[in-house]
């Protein structure tokens, strides 16, 4: 599962996956492969983009059903200095990016070889295979 954190300035891209301990390094390698393929041989298609836009747009009404959710939406308007009618504009904004724009942003911002990994698990079982991947410096925090 992948999500982008809300923030002013740099945003964290979080990729999370529950995996079996003995499959940790293989799962990490697969995540890097999937994103590398996405950036090269298997980029997002027009159909995938259309489905993603439709999914986001169709979920909008349910995102503001509670007072707390609406408060969060209004808070985002203030925090990110958006127009007061931002929530009304949101469906059109979600539909706006073209396939070319999405692919260009992916190339610009998704950098699998620059990621920081946070792995939680049994160190005695996962450390050696993770180091063998060669994804960068490994720091152990206990």
Give the label of every model feature segment.
Residues 1-40, 46-99, 107, 112-120:
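M16 family metallopeptidases and their MPP-like homologs
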Residues 28, 116-142:
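His/Glu-rich zincin catalytic helix
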Residues 33-43, 132-141:
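A common structural junction motif
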